[in-house]
Amino acid sequence: MSFGNSKEIRRSNTMMLIEVLIICYVGYLSSHLVEYVFNSHVVAISDFATQVGIFSVLVVISGLSVGLYEIKLRETFRGIIRRIFVSVAISYFIIEVITNTFLNNVEISQYYLPTYAGMTILVLIVFRYFLNRLGILGLGQSKIVIIGAGERASIIEKRMRREVDRFGFELLGFIPIQGDNREEGIKNEKLIHVNIDENFRNFISDNDIDEIVIACDQRRGTLPVEVLFDCRLRGVEVSDLLDFMERESGQIVVNLMYPSWVIYSNGFNSQNYLRDALDYSMNCIMATIVLMLSWPFMLLTAVIIFFEDVNVKNASVFYKQQRVGHNGQLFNIIKFRSMRPDAEKDGAKWATTNDSRVTKVGQFIRKYRIDELPQLLNVFRGEMSFIGPRPERPEFVEQLIREIPYYNQRHNVKPGLAGWAQLNYPYGASVEDSMEKLKFDLYYVKHQSIMLDILILIRTVEVVLFGKGR
């Protein structure tokens, strides 16, 4: 988490103070709402004030831990909603424990805390929306200028055309410099013609620039290092194109990667035995909970699959398929069968959207990810995690390693039931699709954390509940 210069720290502190006051006021409104709607008295004034105060501080602290007050936070609005939801959910759980442990002798309306938490989520979402739209406090909104207007700089223009892709920043334009490939570069109307010399700092201060992104095609002899260093000393962030794209798009652009960046950049710290043991324990607990909740659906699915192809020879309910797992080790994945028994009579094939080999039952269970549930056994075995890159077949992996740089690095973490790539890229069925998905897989490998796993789980639940699967 980065907090920036003193000006930015004051902005962040101001935001936290404002939201503490807002949450306290929401607590007051919630008490009246509960009394009016449910005709239920909340609690005595002293205990009420204590509860509201603790909850308000907890929400802000949780928000701080998930990056809601980070100066350089760039998120889509849906991403901000998820962070607000997580911070309030954590706070709600803690305040429930505190209330039941230390305030168990106080009569508190059973409707109050759920109402308070729900209204807090709603009010914070509305507040953040208008805050970002109006650019108040400058939090989450930064002015950016790109040095370079050639082929590399055009990647930003191509991948960030939509307004939602630029939700957290304002792009002033591109500064062309010597050595840029202008044939593949930026069009004239988006260019800024300014010399990067000792007067460049005046341009930066006059336009209140927060960040400079280096995206020139040729660096040697074209970048004024002293001028850029002076900008950094003045509190302006200077970023590489690869780091900028990683931060803003949630992916690592593979064709921009170079060996020194992989070696020296933060992240990619996958080998940690203590964390691995903790992850396995948490995965087993989660798998047990999911199994207890889903076993009736699994039993019903197995019966329906059995009767759908009851007269077809060798039509099993489950199927096993070899996949490449952690550190390249092979294992057998277990799934409900969603394709015809003879789906691969001619050899391994990429699965495609609207694949004709998928059965009628298979279409439904794939849409709601029910076919993945037997992989809970793979989780118990330690072959898979809940969150991680989806495992591929060895026949495809051999080809992909030959054709895609750094593809093998996705095997540095355990494969998962759900992954960052599956949420951000449509169903892949080719080498080109695998290249795009790898950008998100590498982002996950580099930034693997509990917070990222929680966000992926929340979005995966949305996919399952609303049938946004394959």
State where each predicted segment sits.
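Signature of alpha-helical transmembrane segments in polytopic membrane proteins
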Residues: 1-139, 470
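C-terminal terminal-structure detector
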Residues: 38, 381, 404-470
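N-terminal hydrophobic signal-anchor/signal peptide
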Residues: 1-21, 126-295
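Membrane-spanning helices that line or support transport/gating and their immediate boundary helices
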Residues: 33, 129, 133, 137, ...
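Membrane-cytosol interface motif
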Residues: 84, 88, 140-158, 313-339
